[in-house]
Regions:
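Sec-dependent bacterial lipoprotein signal peptides
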Residues: 1-3
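Sequence/structural signature of beta-propeller domains
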Residues: 5-372
Length: 372
C-alpha cells in the first residue's frame, strides 16, 4: 500500500453562482498518472463509479477496465486538500446467480452501496472486437467481489449486432446509477438510444432516458418507469477544435437527493492541439422528475413532444478552475459522484472523482463540495 502524494492545496474558492444558489468548494486534489499505486498490482485509476461502504467506512471505486474487472478500495482524508490512499483491489467473480453472459460483458461504470452490504453497478453495453453484443445491465456485487445477479432495462434498450440500428449506442449506455430513499435504483444513459435521436452536438443536447428499477417481492428487480432528460449541447471552447471520440456532452453519473430530486453530472471531452491534454467541461444540475411523463411504453422518442425532466444548473466546474493548481487547467474527466461526510458546518456534501482512463496524460482528481 502506498499513500499518494497530492497536488498543492487549493486556495479558498467562493461559492459558485447559479440559479437559486449552488455548491461550495470545500477541498480538492489532483494526482498525476502513476502516483496512486498498490505495490506491484494494477495501477490505481479508471474510477468511473464511487460509493462509501457503510460497514468499513472506506470508499469503493468501480474501475472501468475489464482485465481484470475489479473494485478499488481506498481511504479519503477530507480537508482543503484531500488525500486518497489506495488500500486494495477486489476482483469480480461469478456467484450462483451470475450468468456467463453477464460475466463476459462486465465493464463497470457506476456504483451504489446497497442496504445490508454489497453494491449495485451498471455495465453500459458494448460491441466487442468480433461484434458480439454485451447488453447494458445493472449488476449486483457482494463486498468480496461475488457477482450475484443482474437486471436489464426494457427491450427497446437492447443492442443489435451488424447494422446497429436499435438500442444502446456502443459504450454509451447505462453510465449512471443512484439509489433513492424509497429504495429504487435509477439509471441514465450517457447518450440517446439510436432510435431516440442524435447524440449531443454543439447546437443541441441529446435526449436520453432515465429508468427506474424496482425490487418486487415475487419477481426480484424489474425495470419500471422511464423519463426523458435533455442534455446540454457540447461546449464550444476556443483552442479545442473537436470532441474526443465519443466525447460529446453526456450524462456520466447521478445522485438522489430525494425520491424525485437528483443531481446530474454532465461532462464532455474536447481535443486540443496535438500533444496537449484534452479539455473536460463539467456541469452539475439539480433535476426533478415530478410532472415528467413516463416514456417506458414508447419504443422511440425521436420527433415526439414530451414533458421532460426539469433541470437547473447548480455548478459549472469551469468557474472553479482559475483558483485551483495548474494541474487542473483543463479540468478533469469526472465520472463518479457520491455523498461525502458532513461538512465543517454540518451540511450535506458530495464527492466527485475523475476517471483517468489509465492514461499517462490524465489525472485522478477529486472535489469535495457542500450542498446549499
Amino acid at each position: 500500500m502506498l499513500a499518494a502524494c497530492s497536488s498543492r492545496a487549493p486556495r479558498p474558492v467562493p461559492e459558485a453562482r447559479a440559479v437559486d444558489g449552488g455548491l461550495r468548494l470545500l477541498g480538492a486534489a489532483a494526482y498525476p498518472a502513476g502516483t496512486l499505486t498498490l505495490g506491484d498490482g494494477p495501477r490505481f485509476g479508471g474510477v468511473s463509479g464511487l460509493a462509501r461502504d457503510p460497514l468499513s467506512g472506506q470508499w469503493v471505486g468501480a474501475i472501468d477496465e475489464n482485465e481484470p474487472q475489479r473494485l478499488a478500495w481506498m481511504d479519503v482524508a477530507f480537508g482543503a486538500t484531500l488525500t486518497v490512499t489506495p488500500l486494495r483491489f477486489t476482483v469480480l467473480h461469478a456467484g450462483p446467480g451470475a450468468s456467463a453472459e453477464t460475466m463476459a460483458g462486465l465493464e463497470l461504470e457506476s456504483l451504489v452501496a446497497m442496504p445490508g452490504g454489497g453494491f449495485a453497478a451498471t455495465t453500459e453495453g458494448y460491441h466487442d472486437a468480433t461484434d458480439i453484443v454485451h447488453q447494458a445491465e445493472v449488476v449486483f456485487v457482494e463486498r468480496d467481489g461475488t457477482v450475484t445477479g443482474a437486471v436489464r432495462p426494457h427491450a427497446h434498450f437492447a443492442m443489435t449486432a451488424g447494422d446497429r440500428g436499435h438500442g444502446v449506442r456502443h459504450n454509451l449506455g447505462l453510465e449512471s446509477l443512484t439509489r433513492t430513499p424509497d429504495g429504487r435504483l435509477i439509471s441514465g444513459l450517457e447518450q440517446p438510444l439510436i432510435q431516440d435521436g442524435s447524440m449531443s452536438n454543439t447546437t443541441r443536447g441529446g435526449l436520453v432516458r432515465l429508468i427506474e428499477f424496482v425490487a418486487r417481492r415475487s419477481a426480484g428487480w424489474t425495470p419500471g418507469r422511464e423519463w426523458a432528460y435533455q442534455l446540454e449541447p457540447t461546449a464550444v471552447v476556443p483552442g479545442f477544435s473537436s470532441p474526443c471520440p465519443d466525447g460529446e456532452n453526456g450524462l456520466s453519473d447521478m445522485l438522489a437527493l430525494g425520491d424525485e430530486r437528483w443531481l446530474m453530472l454532465e461532462r464532455a471531452c474536447l481535443l486540443g492541439p496535438p500533444g496537449t491534454p484534452a479539455y473536460n467541461p463539467v456541469k452539475i444540475f439539480e433535476v426533478s422528475s415530478r410532472g415528467a411523463e413516463d416514456v417506458s411504453r414508447l419504443p422511440a422518442l425521436a420527433g415526439r413532444s414530451l414533458r421532460l425532466v426539469k433541470k437547473r444548473l447548480v455548478l459549472d466546474v469551469d468557474t472553479l478552475l482559475p483558483r485551483l493548481p495548474p494541474l487542473w487547467a483543463t479540468g478533469s474527466n469526472f465520472e463518479a459522484l457520491a455523498f461525502g461526510p458532513p461538512g465543517p458546518l454540518g451540511e450535506r456534501t458530495i464527492l466527485l472523482m475523475s476517471d483517468d482512463n489509465l492514461r499517462p496524460t490524465q489525472t485522478t482528481a477529486v472535489l469535495w463540495l457542500a450542498l446549499p
